[in-house]
Every structure is written in structure tokens, then in C-alpha cells.
Amino acid sequence: MSALVELDQVSAHFTVRGSGWFGGAKQVLRAVDAVSLAIGEGETLALVGESGSGKSTLGQMVAGLRAPTLGSLRFRGGPFATKAARRAIQLVFQDPFSALDPRMPVSSLIAEPLVIQGIGTQAERRTRAALLVEQVGLPRDSLNRYPHEFSGGQRQRIAIARALAPEPALIVADEPLSALDVSIQSQILNLLKSIQEERRLSYLFISHDLGVVNHLADRVAVLYLGKLVELAPRAELFARPSHPYTQALLDAVPRIGRARRRQVALSGEMPSPLAPPPGCVFHTRCPKAQAICRAEIPLLAPAPGRPDQLAACHFKE
């Protein structure tokens, strides 16, 4: 599988001012810290982790909304900050209620990315909007209506149609199901899968719902405190997670027919990204932590006997 987007030691750091009457010393918040991975053509790569792990910030960098502080991104082996890359990468936001301008009809909302990028004539844009609204399962008369006239699931369909308008190669989907009712989530999930099959799209799918990830992803990247701690094919990761943090995330999800093994329970809160722990960033919550974990940063390396499953742990399984 050829790489569509490559991230090489990408970091996102923010400078924040301390508290107090006169402001404290400036501190560096490491939202994403030296992450390297690739998204393949036609692949769904899922990003998972707790709130504050850096998932959305990483997604913003891939979508071109935020430049990395350190490191670099490449698009199909070439420069990332190009018009071709901007057109090829689109974003679907978490909240369909706030992602769509309430003053614009659906036809204009879907066509807006084409206007911004100078694609097609006005007539061609109208034609594409009409085709897309039907492809996402809405009637053609939706084109003249406004966002407030639709349900949450229908608005997310409109947002998906809008993202598809420039014919992208990659869609960054940031928690696209979390604001929807459970009954609607499966419909949108099936829509995303069918669109991918028809168009050979790639997805960077950001989610906290491991059940959804298990149905959609080809590979899974696990983030903790801005660090990539595990990267593996979906089936291997769900069957035999290597990193203790991944084990804990999976153990928190009830599953029928789960293989019997000692469960890993998370204790305590995630440390502040303003003051990450030395060594392995997970050692403050890890039941396997030893002296080496507090002193040395583990490298992302293959798990024993599984070359495609990478984990950053001194005691990976």
C-alpha cells in the first residue's frame, strides 16, 4: 500500500502563560510530541485515546489547519503545503450543528469548497451538489433548504457531501458520530464505508468509541499524552494489544466472547501536558512500571513475533 500522507516526527507545542495576578512564567504545552506514521491510499487509520491525548490536534495538522511546531508532513511523497494537497484533504467535524452556516442553503454549503478552490462553473457546481446530496442519502429537494430544517444525522450527511465536493483523496473525520443518536450512528458509519468503497477514499478517523473503530478501521494508532504508544493492524490490536495503555482501553469496553486474560485497569488522571512525566509518559498509571520506565523513553518498536504491531513500551507483550 502506497503512502498518501506521511508524518515524520511531527510535534505541536503551544506556549501558555502561568496563573497568578501578574501571570506566571511561560510554559510549553506538548499537545503532540514527535509522532511518525503514514496513511495509505484507500486506508482507514483510526486515532484513539483519552480526551487530551492529542488526537484532534494531530488531525488538524493532517487537515492543514495547523502547522507543526517541529517535524514535517508529505503528501504522496511531495510537499504538503500545496494547492493539490489542500484540495485532496477535507475535514468532517464532530458537531454538524455548528459546522454548517445556518444562513446558507444546502446547495451553497456543498458547493462552497469548489468556489473557494476555483473548481468548475456555477452550473457545474450546482450539478455536483445535486449528485452529492443524493449520494449521501438525501432527496434532491434538500438543496434549497437550510440546516435548521434537518436532523443531526441529516446535517452530518450534508457535511459529508460538502467534504466530498472537491473529490478528495483523504477525509479527516474528527469524532463524526459522537454528537449523533446511537440509532443514527450506524447509518452514518455505513455511509462512510460505502463511500470509501466507491471512491477508494482514505480516512483518518478520530474516535473514542472503540466499537466503531473495530468496525471501520484498517489500522489503529493509539495516542497518550501526545505520544504514539501503539500502531497496529486493527485485528491484531483488538485480539492482542501490546501496550498496557491499549490493554486498559480495550478492557474498559464490554465485549462478548472476550478471551480470558488479566485485565489492566487505569488508575489516576492523565498528567498535564505542561509537565509530562520523565521516561515513559504512561509510567505514572501503568501497573507494569519499573525503574527503567521512569528513566528512559521507550522506542516505538515491533512487539515480539509481530513485525506489523509497534508499541512504545519497555515491557511490551
Residue ranges and their predicted role:
Residues 3, 16-23, 28, 231-317:
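Short catalytic/signature loops enriched in Gly
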Residues 63:
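Helix-to-loop junction immediately C-terminal to a conserved catalytic motif
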Residues 71-81, 85:
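Conserved ABC transporter NBD signature motif
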Residues 124-141, 194, 250-251:
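Conserved ABC ATPase "signature" region
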Residues 146-150, 154:
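Conserved ABC ATPase signature
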Residues 165-169:
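A short, proline-enriched helix->beta-strand linker immediately N-terminal to the Walker B motif
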Residues 172, 176-261:
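P-loop NTP-binding/switch modules centered on Walker-like glycine-rich loops
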